[in-house]
Amino acid sequence: MDATAFHPSLWGDFFVKYKPPTAPKRGHMTERAELLKEEVRKTLKAAANQIKNALDLIITLQRLGLDHHYENEISELLRFVYSSSDYDDKDLYVVSLRFYLLRKHGHCVSSDVFTSFKDEEGNFVVDDTKCLLTLYNAAYLRTHGEKVLDEAITFTRRQLEASLLDPLEPALLADEVSLTLQTPLFRRLRILEAINYIPIYGKEAGRNEAILELAKLNFNLAQLIYCEELKEVTLWWKQLNVETNLSFIRDRIVECHFWMTGACCEPQYSLSRVIATKMTALITVLDDMMDTYSTTEEAMLLAEAIYGWEENAAELLPGYMKDFYLYLLKTIDSCGDELGPNRSFRTFYLKEMLKVLVRGSSQEIKWRNENYVPKTISEHLEHSGPSVGAFQVACSSFVGMGDSITKGSFEWLLTYPELAKSLMNIARLLNDTASTKREQNAGHHVSTVQCYMLMHGTTMDEACEKIKELTEDSWKDMMELYLTPTEHPKLIAQTIVDFARTADYMYKETDGFTFSHTIKDMIAKLFVDPISLF
């Protein structure tokens, strides 16, 4: 496939005209959800007396997408769990779930808690599938040097794969095993986990009916908000007249919104999703122009225009770039209007992040033209990490968030802290693993995969395996940094981890953004199909 022959939009004007079937019931659903929230709150408070019950309830609320309604209660419960020794430390399920939830919420818990579950020869002693699943998920919150967690993943994966061959394994549990082997719980997109887990929870014997009903209502209400946002961003996108003026780019506005919703799914982040969706779409145009369509001279003209950020620079650009450049400037200005006078300063950081992205892309063009191969993967990532766009998109989501994200937070982000680099590295390595064959055939710059092949004389398959190992190392970097206290809001670190999850999802088997038919069904589940209440 030629890199400039991307398939057309799969959605077109669908969300401009779409009327969700649940919209007329919005008032009733909201009223019912408010009643159920308080009922579930009482259940959560009652669970404080028993650690296992508390852990089970917290993980259930998280998987159903309800935890944001109970942030204070959950934080308080987990502080109690962290300080209490009143639990069975010989119960692997409890130990694993406790470890998972505490680390996920930023508590430093030692992985030594798992050594007691090994025999004298250092092998894990466990054959219960539910315990294996929980241990496997817990182990993925590992950092560097935690050998016991590395070993736990190897052991549990082997055991879980074997369990799938057991005809006596309950079907529900087998489905959970298959899903977990594909993507461990910590790396799943939270909103998609809710979609997948609601029907599973509905079949569990110990389900709480109030929680189940609330989860369904909560999703359907969120879906209505997403559809309103999709109408807005689709109308915004149509003004670019992509089909006529930019037919060579990836026309993916719905997929952009899907990506942003995967990272920031809570209703209160509506403006954040809209701004980040627009920025992702604009970054996609920039990438396709500079990477696959423009001549070197044209790409450098566009880069210089973005560095200067002046309207009159459009006069120096070729026709197909001119309208895009002016629309880019107009969009950033309109974001400032939406943010209001007290937060409009944030658009400065959108511009600065875009400039960093363009510098990285310019360096890659230079490599391509000179047939230059970076000497190390680190050298490659220094330039290709920023150009992948993941961090710029994450930062654009912060622009639309509340006042807890301060000017100091944005200044810190502009220094590209190590947490940011771990996100960029994960996104770049995943992107290269998924798309390297297509891009090399299209004459792109050397990817990290190709770089490794040339450095070590390996095959592409061998290089891809090594890049996957480096990706795991970057996840360990991220987890280590996530657990390190900083003066900045925890929301920043949490959102950066969420964006790493979206990269993992979009590039799991192939480039799901470019070849978006691979994610079309999931997009429909998120935006089109309401969950039945009965």
From Swiss-Prot:
This is (E)-beta-farnesene synthase. A motif (DDXXD motif) lies at residues 287-291. It is an enzyme of class 4 (lyase). It is found in: Cytoplasm. Sesquiterpene cyclase catalyzing the production of beta-farnesene and alpha-bergamotene in equal amounts from farnesyl diphosphate. Involved in indirect defense by producing volatile signals attracting natural enemies of herbivores. Belongs to the terpene synthase family. Its cofactor is Mg(2+); Co(2+); Mn(2+). Transmembrane segments: none annotated. The Asp-Asp-Xaa-Xaa-Asp/Glu (DDXXD/E) motif is important for the catalytic activity, presumably through binding to Mg(2+). Pathway: Secondary metabolite biosynthesis; terpenoid biosynthesis. One of its GO terms (cellular component) is cytoplasm. It catalyses: (2E,6E)-farnesyl diphosphate = (E)-beta-farnesene + diphosphate. GO terms for biological process: defense response; diterpenoid biosynthetic process. Keywords: Cytoplasm, Lyase, Magnesium, Manganese, Metal-binding, Plant defense. Mg(2+) 1 binds at D287, D291. Its EC number is 4.2.3.47. GO terms for molecular function: magnesium ion binding; terpene synthase activity. Pfam families: Terpene_synth (PF01397), Terpene_synth_C (PF03936). Mg(2+) 2 binds at D287, D291. It comes from the Eukaryota.
